[in-house]
C-alpha cells in the first residue's frame, strides 16, 4: 500500500511539471521577439532599440523583461493587446498558451497606459497620488477662479531642457545642444515651457517650480533688509502691535559674481515678527525698486522657515494692473527664491512693489522677511577650468556667461537660489555639463526633503507630486536622421543613481 501511494504521489508530481521543464527560450527566440518589439516601437519613437533582457518561467506563467526602450512607446489598450498577440505568435508552440506578462521599466506594459485611456474598471485599480499638505507653497488669494480638483495645490518640478554651460575642456561657455534653424534646444524648448506649459499648469491650480530662471527680462533688482551692491532696491519696516526682530542667517547681495561654493543665502540676515489676528495693528515689511524701463517682471520673495512659521504669510504685489495678493506657506520653501508671478511694472520708482503683513488666520506664529528679487537679470556665477584639467601653457580666468540668466543651465541658477554645492555640483566643479543635468534630480530631492514625500531626508519640505523634464532632443544623426520630442520622467521617490536617465 505504501508503494502504491508513493507511486501515485510521484505520478501527480510529474503531471504537474510544465512540458517545457528544463528548457528556456533560445537566443534565436529572444532575438526574434526583440526584433518585433523594436519595429513596433520604431513606428512612434525612432532610435529606441528594444531587446529582451530577461525570461522567467514558473508553472504556466511566463515573464519577458524588455529594456527601457520599450517604455518609450505610447501604450493604449488596443496596442497593448496587439503587442501581446505579436509576441505570443513569436513564441515556441508549446509556450503560446502560457500566461504572458511583458515588463519594461519594472512594470507590465498594460500599467503604462495613461489613465484617461483605460477602462473604468482598470482606473479603479490604480492607486493615485494624494497631496497631504494642508496648504500649497503659494496661493493666489484674489484669483478670479480657483480650481478645487485635478492639479489644484499640486507641486510640479518642471525644467525646460538644457542651457548654456561652461565647458571645462574647452575653457569657454557654450550651448549644450546642436545649433539648428537659427536656434538650439537650450533656447527653443523654453518657447513651449515658459509662455504655454507653465501658465497652463498654474491656471489649472498647480504650483510650478523650475531649476532655471523663468524670466526673460534682462533687468534684475534685488531689494533686501541687508545693505548690498544693488542701489535700486530698498527695504523698510512698519511696526504695529508687535516688533520686528532678527531671525538668524539669510540672504545678502554682497557680490557682483559668485564663485562655486559661495551662497548669497548664507551671507546676510532675515527679519521676523509674530503674527496677529484680525483687528490688531499689523506690522509690515515693504520692498521698493527703481526700474530702468517699464515692462513685465517676475517677482520672487524669500524667507526663512522656522519651527513655528505661518502657513499663510500674506504678500501684496503692486503693479500697473492694480494689486495681486498671495498667501505663502512659510513652513516650506525657506532659503531660496519663491516665485509669485510676473507683473507689469513702471519705469522709475515702484514704491511698495511688494508688501508682507503679519496678519494671519492664527495669531502667535511667525512670518519672516528676507530679500525680494524682481526680474531675471544676467548670469552672475563665474566659472573657470578645474585644477585637474589645467595645462602649464593655458590661460585661465573666472568669467560669467555674459548671457541673460534664463539662457543658462540649472547648475548656475541653483547656486544663485541658495542650494548647497552637493545639489548643483555633484561632479565637484570638474564637469559643468554633467553637473547641469544631474543637479536637477538632486534639486527635486532637496525640494521634497522633509515633506511627506521624503520624510527621512532633510530639505525644503515641498511635497513634490511630479518631476518632469521637457526636451525636444533637437539634433541629427548619421544618415540625416532627426531626433524628436522626448519627455523624461522618474518614478522612484529618491534619485540616487549616477545615470541621468535611469528610470527604474
Show the residue positions of the predicted features.
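Non-catalytic propeptide/linker segments at domain boundaries
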Residues: 73-162, 167, 375-396
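Catalytic-core regions of hydrolytic enzymes
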Residues: 152-241, 382-481
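N-proximal, solvent-exposed amphipathic alpha-helical segments enriched in charged/polar residues
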Residues: 22-59
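Extracellular carbohydrate recognition and processing domains
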Residues: 320-348
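Single conserved hydrophobic/aromatic residue that forms the stacking wall/gate
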Residues: 495-504
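A short beta-strand element within beta-rich, extracytoplasmic domains
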Residues: 283-307
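Short beta-strand-plus-loop segments that form exposed binding edges in beta-rich domains
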Residues: 355-364
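Short, surface-exposed beta-strand/strand-loop-strand elements in extracellular ectodomains
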Residues: 307-322
Amino acid at each position: 500500500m505504501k508503494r502504491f501511494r508513493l507511486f501515485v504521489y510521484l505520478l501527480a508530481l510529474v503531471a504537474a511539471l510544465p512540458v517545457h521543464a528544463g528548457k528556456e527560450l533560445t537566443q534565436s527566440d529572444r532575438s526574434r521577439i526583440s526584433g518585433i518589439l523594436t519595429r513596433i516601437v520604431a513606428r512612434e519613437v525612432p532610435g529606441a532599440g528594444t531587446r529582451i533582457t530577461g525570461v522567467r518561467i514558473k508553472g504556466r506563467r511566463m515573464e519577458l523583461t524588455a529594456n527601457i526602450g520599450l517604455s518609450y512607446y505610447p501604450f493604449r489598450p488596443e496596442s497593448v493587446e496587439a503587442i501581446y498577440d505579436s509576441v505570443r505568435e513569436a513564441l515556441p508552440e508549446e509556450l503560446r498558451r502560457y500566461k504572458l506578462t511583458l515588463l519594461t521599466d519594472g512594470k507590465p506594459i498594460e500599467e503604462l497606459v495613461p489613465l484617461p485611456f483605460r477602462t473604468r474598471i482598470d482606473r479603479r485599480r490604480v492607486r493615485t497620488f494624494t497631496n497631504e499638505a494642508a496648504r500649497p507653497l503659494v496661493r493666489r488669494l484674489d484669483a478670479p477662479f480657483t480650481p478645487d480638483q485635478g492639479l489644484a495645490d499640486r507641486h510640479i518640478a518642471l525644467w525646460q531642457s538644457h542651457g548654456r554651460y561652461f565647458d571645462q575642456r574647452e575653457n569657454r561657455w557654450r550651448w549644450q545642444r546642436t545649433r539648428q534653424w537659427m536656434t538650439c534646444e537650450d533656447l527653443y524648448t523654453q518657447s513651449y515651457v515658459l509662455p504655454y506649459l507653465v501658465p497652463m499648469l498654474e491656471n489649472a491650480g498647480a504650483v510650478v517650480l523650475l531649476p532655471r530662471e523663468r524670466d526673460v527680462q534682462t533687468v534684475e533688482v534685488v531689494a533686501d533688509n541687508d545693505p548690498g551692491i544693488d542701489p535700486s532696491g530698498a527695504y523698510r519696516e512698519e511696526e504695529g502691535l508687535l516688533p520686528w526682530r532678527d531671525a538668524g542667517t539669510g540672504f545678502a547681495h554682497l557680490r557682483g559674481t559668485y564663485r562655486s561654493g559661495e551662497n548669497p543665502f548664507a551671507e546676510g540676515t532675515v527679519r521676523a515678527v509674530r503674527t496677529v489676528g484680525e483687528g490688531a495693528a499689523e506690522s509690515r515689511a515693504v520692498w521698493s525698486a527703481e526700474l530702468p524701463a517699464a515692462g513685465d517682471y517676475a517677482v520672487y520673495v524669500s524667507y526663512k522657515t522656522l519651527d513655528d512659521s505661518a502657513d499663510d504669510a500674506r504678500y501684496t504685489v503692486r503693479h500697473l494692473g492694480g494689486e495681486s495678493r498671495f498667501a505663502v506657506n512659510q513652513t516650506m520653501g525657506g532659503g531660496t527664491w519663491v516665485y509669485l508671478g510676473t507683473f507689469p511694472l513702471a519705469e522709475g520708482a515702484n514704491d511698495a512693489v511688494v508688501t508682507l503683513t503679519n496678519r494671519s488666520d492664527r495669531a502667535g506664529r511667525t512670518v519672516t522677511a528676507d530679500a525680494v528679487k524682481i526680474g531675471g537679470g544676467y548670469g552672475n556665477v563665474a566659472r573657470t577650468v578645474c585644477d585637474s584639467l589645467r595645462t602649464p601653457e593655458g590661460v585661465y580666468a573666472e568669467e560669467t556667461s555674459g548671457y541673460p540668466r534664463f539662457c543658462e543651465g540649472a547648475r548656475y541658477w541653483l547656486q544663485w537660489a541658495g542650494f548647497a554645492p552637493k545639489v548643483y555640483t555633484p561632479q565637484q566643479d570638474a564637469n559643468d555639463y554633467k553637473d547641469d543635468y544631474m543637479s536637477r534630480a538632486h534639486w527635486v530631492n532637496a525640494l521634497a526633503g522633509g515633506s511627506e514625500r521624503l520624510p527621512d531626508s532633510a530639505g525644503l519640505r515641498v511635497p513634490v507630486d511630479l518631476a518632469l523634464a521637457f526636451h525636444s532632443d533637437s539634433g541629427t544623426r548619421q544618415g540625416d536622421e532627426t531626433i524628436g520630442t522626448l519627455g523624461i520622467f522618474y518614478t522612484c521617490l529618491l534619485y540616487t543613481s549616477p545615470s541621468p536617465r535611469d528610470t527604474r
